[in-house]
Every structure is written in structure tokens, then in C-alpha cells.
From Swiss-Prot:
It comes from Saccharomyces cerevisiae (strain ATCC 204508 / S288c). Its cofactor is Mn(2+). This is Superoxide dismutase [Mn], mitochondrial. GO terms for cellular component: mitochondrial matrix; mitochondrion. Belongs to the iron/manganese superoxide dismutase family. It catalyses: 2 superoxide + 2 H(+) = H2O2 + O2. Destroys superoxide anion radicals which are normally produced within the cells and which are toxic to biological systems. The keyword Chaperone does not apply. Residues 1-26 form a transit peptide. InterPro entries: Fe/Mn_Superoxide_Dismutase (IPR050265), Mn/Fe_SOD (IPR001189), Mn/Fe_SOD_BS (IPR019833), Mn/Fe_SOD_C (IPR019832), Mn/Fe_SOD_N (IPR019831), Mn/Fe_SOD_N_sf (IPR036324), SOD_C_sf (IPR036314). GO terms for molecular function: manganese ion binding; superoxide dismutase activity. The gene is SOD2.
Amino acid sequence: MFAKTAAANLTKKGGLSLLSTTARRTKVTLPDLKWDFGALEPYISGQINELHYTKHHQTYVNGFNTAVDQFQELSDLLAKEPSPANARKMIAIQQNIKFHGGGFTNHCLFWENLAPESQGGGEPPTGALAKAIDEQFGSLDELIKLTNTKLAGVQGSGWAFIVKNLSNGGKLDVVQTYNQDTVTGPLVPLVAIDAWEHAYYLQYQNKKADYFKAIWNVVNWKEASRRFDAGKI
């Protein structure tokens, strides 16, 4: 689950609410990490985690908060002056909300999806999730192989998500997205893997396949199992 600082700002009636309907809203913030920056070494370096969290993720936090503020201001303006020009401005701001909001939520999922080996990182899933993986993919290794294929297929920047699809009886699937697009609606993200260069380049340089292979040593399958059982993040 999201850390308290993020959850308090986003959770409404048990779900994820990115836009407040009140005149005054609480801005989103970086989530608390449950481990130190260096705790995922040697698979992900402390330097990468520190920059990823304090610089890149913070940029999405700032960008999302700014975009939501601008959207609310434009909403008020459009109510007073319902012109095509103001409508176009709102459309443009929605694109920023989608990008920075996706970056914010994707990274919140990403940090929760990781854990050092001392906290169970890399340990295979158990229970209902393990059974579903075996039934659909034959083994965890086959699911990881499929996910890595999706990650390798990202041209430029993007993500791969292992999801539970609530629209087809809760079947598992692997979804590839570009830039900071996220999964929504009936797709419950169980595992989110960042394929942007900032997630690996300082350590793995152009050998991103090595990063895709290494990260599974610190994937938090306990968190994935919790989301699978709950049917929500």
C-alpha cells in the first residue's frame, strides 16, 4: 500500500482520488520509503535510488500539484468565461495532469513493489497469487520472462505492469505503457517496473536487459499478493 503521506492525500472512500473536489486541497507528497537508498544493492545502487526518489519522483509531485492548481483556476475561469480559448487551456492542463499524475502514482507503486532481501525482496509469491501465476503462465519464471519481453519492447521510456484484470474474472496480464501512462479502471497494478533510463542508466548504462533481470531479486511479492487478494492498491 502507499505510505501514509501519500495515502492520506489520495485516498477517498477506499479508492484512489487524484483530484480533490473541495476548494482547498491537500497537495500530494513523496511517500515514505520503508528502506534506505542503499538497501537494494547490488541490484539497484543507492545513488540511483536517491536520485530517482529525491529528484525524478519529486519532479512529478511538483508537476502534478502545479497542474491541478492550474486546472482548478481554469475551471473557475471557464465558469465565468465559457470561451473556446479557456476550454483549450483546460485541455492542455489535463495533459500535464495525466503525465505528472502518472509519474507520481507509478513511482509510488514502484517503491512499494521493491524490498531488500532482508525484508523478503525476491522471495516468490505464495497463496492465491502463486496459484494464479502457475495456472496462467506455468511458473513464476515464465511470467518474469514475459514481463521482461514487454519491458524490452518499450521504445524510449515507459513501464510494464503485472495486473489483475477485474473485468475478466481477475485474470493476470502484463501491460506495457509509454512515458508515464499508468493502468486504471479494472486493471489493478500488482507489480510496476520502471523502464525509463533514469531507473538504471547510472549503474547498467546501455545494458538495460541486465537491469530487467536484476530487479526481480528485490521485487516485493508480498505487496503484490496483498493487492491481488484485495483487488485494489
